């Protein structure tokens, strides 16, 4: 792999990590300002830890047995997933990282909400698009807001990376 290709891929990973942090900081702001509940990434870790035992779907992830290091696994998975999403955007969008624009990042970020809606929430016992939660509309809007913020973060971080590292497609 050439140095230029490695720089490009590492820049994409940096964008993903930064966008995930951007999303988390926005969630923290909403929590501190309006009392909006924070996502529980420990439950994501619990889900991944149960996978090693062959359990991929739960009636209620909150009622599933706790696992050692589930919080660490959940937070690490959260950031790795953010990096993988950014790599995906960069690899399918051609020259976007060298010339970032908001619309592709925003649309991609919004599109990533399909993963929790169609994979994670059903696997957690929450139903497709949180249909089994006490307030599905509120849960859906929170997911959509988080992933929209991730999309904005992709753009903001790509612009930032461009100023630190010369990125060429």
Residues of each region from the PLM?
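Juxtamembrane/disordered regions of integral membrane proteins
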Residues: 1-169
């Amino acid at each position: 792999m050439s140095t230029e290709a490695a720089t490009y891929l590492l820049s994409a990973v940096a964008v993903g990590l930064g966008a995930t942090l951007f999303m988390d900081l926005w969630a923290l702001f909403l929590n501190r300002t309006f009392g909006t509940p924070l996502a529980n990434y420990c439950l994501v870790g619990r889900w991944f830890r149960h996978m090693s035992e062959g359990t991929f779907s739960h009636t209620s992830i909150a009622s599933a047995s706790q696992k050692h290091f589930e919080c660490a696994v959940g937070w690490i998975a959260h950031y790795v997933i953010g990096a993988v999403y950014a790599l995906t955007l960069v690899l399918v969008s051609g020259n976007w990282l060298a010339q970032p624009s908001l619309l592709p990042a925003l649309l991609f970020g919004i599109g990533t909400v399909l993963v929790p809606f169609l994979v994670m929430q059903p696997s957690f016992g929450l139903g497709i698009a949180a249909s089994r939660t006490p307030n599905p509309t509120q849960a859906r809007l929170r997911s959509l807001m988080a992933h929209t913020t991730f999309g904005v973060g992709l753009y903001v971080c790509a612009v930032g990376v461009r100023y630190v590292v010369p990125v060429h497609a």
